[in-house]
Structure formats: structure tokens, C-alpha cells
């Protein structure tokens, strides 16, 4: 959510920046008129309340003097009715304003490249050598089928499309990966490990920006106003909703492993096979609460920490700076880390690292004090995948595949897999 005072003072300038995000600004254009009406109503109500207090004092004087006060009492009642009517209109206007404010996307940071689609994203850096094959590299679902470690067919029978059973060494590889990721972030980067709830309430989904705009993309629990989490970012960020933190406690860094649930609305026909686009998948999420002046330095740290996972796994990747049109609703700046997928001859997203500035903190009312009696300020929040586990499994199977159908296990994972070096058919 954007700051109302900032919107009021810089309306046209902010609108020009939001145009680059390609968002529908129909509601945004209503803000000025509604905000003016709100301020006008507040002024009228305050004026009438002052008049009512004045009249009330006159009634008291007349009654003490045992004089007729009926005409003034009538006037006071009329003023009261007018206040009631204006208060009702004020509540309606404020509700409309709240709806508009919740629908306005975050403002892109000045360093974000201007563009309309993913084709306008800018490559920041590359790391690693792409593997070369003397044969046509197989897709990970075929490799997994030969190894007997993933079962999409039975998962479709049990649940539906875009689900999977991990079996045997597949399950162990998945577990090895998220344990390795958590150990790295907790031990090397001093994150606090958290296991969050997998269901959250409406206020939590609103706080991080999934609601109201993206409700159709969420899995909702029937008969309850609960949602399955699309990412651990939602419960972890909302841990500190409606709190005032001590400035000395910042930055706060959390690393959380969780299942994530996505409806993938709008993705029909895309990535219908394999692990790239599932309704349920595991992810290690990194969430930061920081002082505003530190947030862009922390974004670089966060991105480097997510990259470190791929470096230790020796998987080639690139880092992309998202353009304004591909930035999403909540981020002020975002990097996507994309891992090399040989069978597709392209890089695919495996992590997004975002700085939301105060956008989420304002929605979730998360503040801090620099000093014990200082004025509360909104924190800046950041989050990034460290990493999406299923996509990492896919990348390992494809980049480490051998012509005989076996897959070499990355060296860093071997202690987590009983010191095995290879998975064989």
C-alpha cells in the first residue's frame, strides 16, 4: 500500500511511474476526487460537531436560568442528524478509498529497467558453464521415470494434474536439498529458521499483497476464511503484523521451509509435464525486515545468498533484473535467478528476490522505532526463494544426467544422501 500523503502530493508523478508497470489504473484515477471528498466531509463533520457543542452549552445555560430551550434542542437534534448522515457518507468514501489503495501497485525503483514484457528484462550476470552432451539431453521427467524416483501418473490418479509423488532416492534428493539449503542459510548467513502454518487468514493474505487482487489464484478453504499459502513469505511477513519493532533488532532474517500451493490460473497449456509448474511444491523462503536506508544493500545480499545455493550445487544460472512491466504488483525492485535447463535449451526461473520497500509493511502495519520513544516508522520488507526445491531437482536431473541414464549427485549433497555419488536406473 502506498502512503496517502505521498499520493496526494505527487499524484501525477506516481501515475506516470505506474503506467510503466502496465497495470489497470482505472481505480487509481478515482483517488484524487474521493480523497478531496473525504477531506471535505471530515471538515464539515468537525464544523458541525463544534456547532453542536456550542448549542449544547446554550441549552445548559437556558435550563439553569429556567428559560425555554425547546427551539435550541430542536436545532441540536437537526445538527446531530446532519452529522449522522455525513458520517455515513464518510464511511462509504473511506471504504472506497481503502479498496483503491489496496489495488494500487508498488512504485518501481528508479534503477528498474523500463519495459513491457519479460523480453525487456536485463541480464545482470551469468555464472557457471553449461554442460555439453554427446546426445540429445533428456527432460527431467524422462530421466526420473527411468530412475523410478517421480510418479506423476499415480499423483494424477490420487489428486489431479500438476501433482507428483517423490519416491525412493527422489524423496531423499528432495529432502537433501531443503536440508542443505536451510543449513546454508542458518549456519552461514545467520537466518533464524521457522516452520510456518500452511494456512493463513484473509488479513495475512492482504498484508503481503495477494488479496484482494489475486484471490482467484489462491486455494481457499471452503467454509473457512483461510487460504493455503502460496509461499512462506505470507505467514512469515505477517508474524510481525501490527507490531512495533525495536530498531536495534533490525535486520531480522528468517529462513522457512514450507509447501506452497498455487492454482496456476492463466497457465493452462504451459509446462504441463514435469516439476516446473506444480500446484503443490516445496520451497525454502528467505524473509527480511530491515531499516529503509538498508533495504537495497540487503536486496543484493539476499540475491547473492540465493545464488550461493546454485554455486555450491554447481548449476549454471543467470541473474535478471525485472523490467517495470514484469515486476509484479508488490515489488519495487526484483531480481529473478534463472537456472539452465538443458532439455529446453534455456534458463528458467528458480528464485525471485524482491524489495517491497514499505509497501507490505504499510498494509500489514509493521513498524519500528529507532529510539525507545521515537516516532514509529514502517520497516522495509524483502523476500527471496532460497530456492524452489522441485525446480532444483529438475535442474540437477538435467544438468547431471549421463548417457547411461544415471545421474551424478552434486558433491555438496552427498553427505545428505548417505555419501552416494550416483543415482542409477
Curated annotation (Swiss-Prot):
ATP binds at residues 262-264, 349-352. Its main location: cytoplasm. It comes from the Bacteria. It catalyses: tRNA(Ser) + L-serine + ATP = L-seryl-tRNA(Ser) + AMP + diphosphate + H(+); tRNA(Sec) + L-serine + ATP = L-seryl-tRNA(Sec) + AMP + diphosphate + H(+). The keyword Cytoplasm applies. GO terms for biological process: selenocysteine biosynthetic process; seryl-tRNA aminoacylation. Its EC number is 6.1.1.11. Pathway: Aminoacyl-tRNA biosynthesis; selenocysteinyl-tRNA(Sec) biosynthesis; L-seryl-tRNA(Sec) from L-serine and tRNA(Sec): step 1/1. It is found in: Cytoplasm. L-serine binds at residues 231-233, 285, 385. GO terms for cellular component: cytoplasm. GO terms for molecular function: ATP binding; catalytic activity, acting on a protein; serine-tRNA ligase activity; transferase activity. InterPro entries: aa-tRNA-synt_IIb (IPR002314), aa-tRNA-synth_II (IPR006195), aa-tRNA-synth_II/BPL/LPL (IPR045864), Ser-tRNA-ligase_type_1 (IPR002317), Ser-tRNA-synth_1_N (IPR015866), SerRS_1_N_sf (IPR042103), SerRS_core (IPR033729), tRNA-bd_arm (IPR010978). SUPFAM superfamilies: Class II aaRS and biotin synthetases, tRNA-binding arm. Keywords: Aminoacyl-tRNA synthetase, ATP-binding, Cytoplasm, Ligase, Nucleotide-binding, Protein biosynthesis. Consists of two distinct domains, a catalytic core and a N-terminal extension that is involved in tRNA binding. Catalyzes the attachment of serine to tRNA(Ser). Is also able to aminoacylate tRNA(Sec) with serine, to form the misacylated tRNA L-seryl-tRNA(Sec), which will be further converted into selenocysteinyl-tRNA(Sec). Homodimer. The tRNA molecule binds across the dimer. Belongs to the class-II aminoacyl-tRNA synthetase family. Type-1 seryl-tRNA synthetase subfamily. This is Serine--tRNA ligase.
Amino acid at each position: 500500500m502506498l502512503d496517502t500523503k505521498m499520493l496526494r502530493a505527487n499524484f501525477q508523478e506516481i501515475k506516470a511511474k505506474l503506467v510503466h508497470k502496465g497495470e489497470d489504473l482505472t481505480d487509481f484515477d478515482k483517488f484524487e476526487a474521493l480523497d478531496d471528498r473525504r477531506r471535505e466531509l471530515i471538515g464539515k463533520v468537525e464544523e458541525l460537531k463544534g456547532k453542536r457543542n456550542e448549542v449544547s452549552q446554550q441549552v445548559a445555560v437556558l435550563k439553569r436560568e429556567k428559560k425555554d430551550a425547546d427551539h435550541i434542542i430542536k436545532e441540536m437534534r437537526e445538527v446531530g442528524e446532519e452529522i449522522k448522515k455525513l458520517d455515513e457518507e464518510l464511511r462509504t468514501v473511506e471504504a472506497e478509498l481503502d479498496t483503491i489503495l489496496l489495488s494500487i501497485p508498488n512504485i518501481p525503483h528508479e534503477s528498474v529497467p523500463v519495459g513491457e514484457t519479460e523480453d525487456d528484462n536485463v541480464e545482470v550476470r551469468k555464472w557457471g558453464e553449461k554442460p555439453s552432451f554427446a546426445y540429445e539431453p533428456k527432460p527431467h521427467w524422462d530421466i526420473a521415470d527411468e530412475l523410478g524416483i517421480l510418479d506423476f501418473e499415480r499423483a494424477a490418479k490420487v489428486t489431479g494434474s500438476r501433482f507428483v509423488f517423490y519416491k525412493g532416492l527422489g524423496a531423499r534428493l528432495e529432502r537433501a536439498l531443503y536440508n542443505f539449503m536451510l543449513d546454508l542459510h542458518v549456519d552461514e548467513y545467520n537466518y533464524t529458521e521457522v516452520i510456518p502454518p500452511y494456512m493463513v487468514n484473509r488479513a495475512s493474505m492482504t498484508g503481503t499483497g495477494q488479496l484482494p487482487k489475486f484471490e482467484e489464484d489462491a486455494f481457499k478453504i471452503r467454509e473457512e476464511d483461510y487460504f493455503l499459502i502460496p509461499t512462506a513469505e505470507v505467514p512469515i511477513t505477517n508474524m510481525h503484523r501490527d507490531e512495533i519493532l525495536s530498531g536495534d533488532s533490525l535486520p531480522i532474517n528468517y529462513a522457512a521451509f514450507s509447501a506452497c500451493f498455487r492454482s496456476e490460473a492463466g497457465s493452462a497449456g504451459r509446462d504441463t509435464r514435469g516439476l516446473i509448474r506444480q500446484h503443490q511444491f516445496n520451497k525454502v523462503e528467505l524473509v527480511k525486515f530491515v531499516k529503509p536506508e538498508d533495504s537495497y544493500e540487503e536486496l543484493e545480499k539476499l540475491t547473492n545468498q540465493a545464488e550461493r545455493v546454485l554455486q555450491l550445487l554447481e548449476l549454471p544460472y543467470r541473474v535478471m533484473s525485472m523490467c517495470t512491466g514484469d515486476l509484479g504488483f508488490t515489488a519495487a525492485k526484483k531480481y529473478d535467478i534463472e537456472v539452465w535447463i538443458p532439455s529446453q535449451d534455456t534458463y528458467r526461473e528458480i528464485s525471485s528476490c524482491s524489495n517491497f520497500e514499505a509497501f507490505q509493511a504499510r498494509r500489514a502495519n509493521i513498524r519500528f522505532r529507532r529510539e525507545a520513544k521515537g516516532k514509529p516508522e514502517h520497516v522495509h520488507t524483502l523476500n527471496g526463494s532460497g530456492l524452489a526445491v522441485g525446480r532444483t531437482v529438475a535442474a540437477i536431473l538435467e544438468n547431471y544426467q549421463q548417457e547411461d541414464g544415471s545421474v551424478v549427485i552434486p558433491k555438496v549433497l552427498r553427505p545428505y544422501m548417505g555419501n552416494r555419488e550416483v543415482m542409477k536406473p
